Amino acid sequence: MKFLLLTVGLALIGAIQAVENIRSKNDLGVEKFVGSWYLREAAKTMEFSIPLFDMDIKEVNLTPEGNLELVLLEKADRCVEKKLLLKKTQKPTEFEIYISSESASYTFSVMETDYDSYFLFCLYNISDREKMACAHYVRRIEENKGMNEFKKILRTLAMPYTVIEVRTRDMCHV
């Protein structure tokens, strides 16, 4: 019994350290995000009216104010284009999204990217900084880079969460 308690205690300490080691990037070249991105995988702890978890990103545009504009493609009966504005904050890797249908604001935080192949982001509820969802986007449909980094980030989500694996045939192709 003592051995079991010791094992559980050590596992918890390891999990806490793993969570602390995953931070968002310190700097971000937002101009390098311009272009198309495809949703590879997403995980969320709740349902959102934010379409970001069901869509490919047709374009990422940089506004003159330094904000990001996402042009999204949602697949319903057909592919429909929608726009979402991410307002810059004091932190270079974080943007604010206000969703009027939810009367809520979220922080869009870029966790990891190599700019050429993949980027990982998480959404936080602004009021309590609780991580609500994370997603893995890639530049090319067949790309899988960033998968290990995404799995590490998933370990930081509150339980339970739902993982959505995207099939390329279900995507709106840009």
UniProtKB/Swiss-Prot annotation:
Presence of keyword Hydrolase: no
First-listed, main subcellular location of the protein, grouped into a coarse class: secreted
UniProt xrefs under SUPFAM superfamilies: Lipocalins
Pfam families attached to this UniProt entry: Lipocalin
Keywords: Disulfide bond, Milk protein, Retinol-binding, Secreted, Signal, Transport
Keyword Transport: yes
Disulphide bonds in the chain: 79-172, 122-134
Subcellular location(s) of the protein: Secreted
GO CC terms in record: extracellular region
GO molecular function terms attached to this record: retinol binding
Taxonomy, superkingdom: Eukaryota
Signal peptide boundaries: 1-18
PANTHER family assigned: GLYCODELIN, LIPOCALIN
Known role: Lactoglobulin is the primary component of whey, it binds retinol and is probably involved in the transport of that molecule.
Family: Belongs to the calycin superfamily. Lipocalin family.
Assembly and oligomerization: Monomer.
Name this polypeptide is given: Beta-lactoglobulin
The species this protein was found in: Notamacropus eugenii (Tammar wallaby)
